Each structure stands twice: as structure tokens, then as C-alpha cells.
Amino acid sequence: MTRTFLNLPALLLAWTVIVVVAYTPTPPKISPATNRPNQLYTWRKQQIRYQQAGPENGDPVLLVHGLFVNSDHWRKTLLGLADEGYNVYAIDLWGYGYSSKPPYDSPEARAVCGENKRFADDESLAILRDVPLGNPSGKGERVRDIELRHPVRSPYNFFTWSELITDFCRQVVPKRPVTLVCNSIGTISSLQAVIDTPDLYTGVCVVTPNFRELHSAEIAFPALSMPVVRAIQKALREKGQPLFDALAKPETVRQILKEPYKVQDAIDDTLVQVLLDPLLSEGASKIVFDTLSYSAGPLPEQQLSIFPDDKPVWITYGTSDPWTPDKRVDALINKPCVEKVVPLPGIGHCPHDEAPELVNPFILEFLKRVKPKDEKEAQ
């Protein structure tokens, strides 16, 4: 008994190492999507995969991916912006791609959580009262309370990811203001990063926002419907592995992508491979179901209402996106920080991969808009 007690620190350390190694996938040396080296950044003892392209003295840009994908989803943007002289980074958010995926309830994961300090001193900060939100019609507003804390206190949340973005920009990107380009739910992490640390960023270019239809503030009659939703979420977390195994196959992934992608030719073998391979790594399925249980956190209209006015936001989106109400996106132009909203007819949820010939010029125009004044004058 005494020997076991004395060895306890060593046993705990060994167990931590085992957990870190087991839930830290090894990426290929070269990304098959971009032909760029996969690089690793150690963040809070976690592995974060990222890619970089373009001259290091170029204006820095960070690409932030959306739900269940990874930095390879920016394959056409990373290289397109780099060819124009920008220093471009694309990151795998913690829990996605080839970044670490420890179990959400492990001590290792809990230590990383971005909610730890944010709500520690005042629990009342975890709920925003009477927040105006948009409607699918784009007309009028609904007033809702917004729960900010993850319902099961998972560390895989927007506050954690926003802190990762900021730490990455401070520690990896050359010390210059960074422009964020984001897709889908990557928008929420990106907006939060700028809200929390505005001096580090020039602005945000949004390629399709996400209104998070599973959020408790977005679901109709939440007092009645949320208990049912959370029961389903709990069942998926606990017993969803067979369903995940059935869906995590190349042909199934290809079929699933046909819903958000309206430009079907963009769904090639490389896309299927680079999205599926990391999802087959240890711990990935648990992160998928954990994310589907995330019915709280910030919402884009709430964030844009408190966004720094001197940090421009431009938005583009596909009008054929089945998940994003176009009129509600158009209404975001009424937020003071939003300078431009551009619809792309016939494009789906992933315009950067479906129509890079339209999206890359839009991003490049935004990058010129936010270029530091002294650099503009020097040109």
C-alpha cells in the first residue's frame, strides 16, 4: 500500500502520457489536399495540426474550418491566397482533424477548457438575457436568453477554440495583425477571438455563417423540446458508436456531402479522403457526438452586436445552402461592423471549396480593405 501511494505521482504521469499518445493522431508528412507539409503546434500540452503556405513576410491570414472538417477543407483557399503573396495558415481546431482528441471528461481535457476562467467568478455571466436574434425571413427579431456554457461542461466549446486561435496567432504567426477567414461554425470561434483580443486582428471574412439550429435559443418551444433534444443527444453520446461506424465509409461520406455541396463536381476522391481519414482516428467519434450535444454557446448575431466597430466583417454565402437561411444572412448587414454581404447564386454551404473562383477574389478584396494603413501608403 505504501509503495503504491509513493508511486502514485509516477502512475498518474504515465497514465497522462498514455492518454495523450492514444488520442493524438499522426498526420501524413504531406497533406494530400494541398501538397504542403503538415506541421504541429503544442498548445496546453495538446497537439494542433496546421499548414502554412506563402511568403513569411506576407500579411498573415488564418483560415478556420467548420463542423467535423479540418484544415484540408481550405485546400483551394490556402494555395490561392498564398499565390497572391499572403502568409496563409490553416489550423485543425482542437478535437478535429489531426489535432489531439482526449475524452471530454478526462482531467487532461478539462484543464484546457476555455470556460474555466470565463465563468468562474460569476455564474450569472453564463447566461445572456433578452438577446435579440434574427428570423429565417430576415424580418423582425426574436428575444431569447442565450446559455453560454456547454450543457455537459465539455471543453470542446467555442471559448476553448477562440483561445486556441488567439494563442496560435501570438505564438506561431509572425507578430503582425492577423486576418481571420472562417467557414460555418468556425465563424463563432473567430468572432469570439476578435471580441476578446481585438488588437491582435484586422477583421473577419466570413464564408457562410452558421446560426446553430440545435442551440437552445434557436429551437422552438425550448421548455418542451429541449428535454427531448438533450435525451437524444445523451443517447448518441453513450450509444452512438455503431451509427458512426456505419456512416464513416467513403461512399457514405460522399453521399452526405451532396446535401451541403451544390457544386457536385467539387466532391472528389481527395475531399472524401481528407475529411474521412481523421474521423477514423481514436477519439474522433466521441468528439462528433459531443459536438452534436453542444446546444449552448455564443451566437453570431449576439457576437456581431458587441463586435468592435473598427474591425470590419465581410460575409459571403451560397444561396442554395440548405442549412443557412439566406434572408437571415442578408439581415446581418444591419450590424454596424458588417460592411458587406454578398450572396453567391447556386452555391451551397462550402463556397470556398465549391466556387473558389468566386470566393478567393472576395477574400482578396477584403484583405486589401483591412491592410494596415502604412502598408497601403507604401504601395
Predicted regions mapped to residue ranges:
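Flexible "cap/lid" loop of the alpha/beta hydrolase fold
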Residues: 188-191, 195, 200-240
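Active-site loop/oxyanion-hole signature of alpha/beta-hydrolase fold enzymes
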Residues: 37-44, 51, 93-181, 361
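Catalytic active-site module of serine/aspartate enzymes centered on a nucleophile-bearing elbow/loop
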Residues: 337-379
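Conserved loop-alpha-helix segment in the C-terminal half of the alpha/beta-hydrolase fold
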Residues: 306-347
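Short beta-strand-to-loop junctions in surface cap/lid or active-site-entrance loops
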Residues: 48-59
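Serine-hydrolase catalytic-loop signature spanning alpha/beta hydrolases and amidase-signature enzymes
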Residues: 66-76, 88
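Conserved alpha/beta-hydrolase catalytic His-Asp/Glu region
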Residues: 216, 240-307
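Active-site glycine-rich loops that stabilize anionic/oxyanionic intermediates
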Residues: 58, 66-69, 184-185
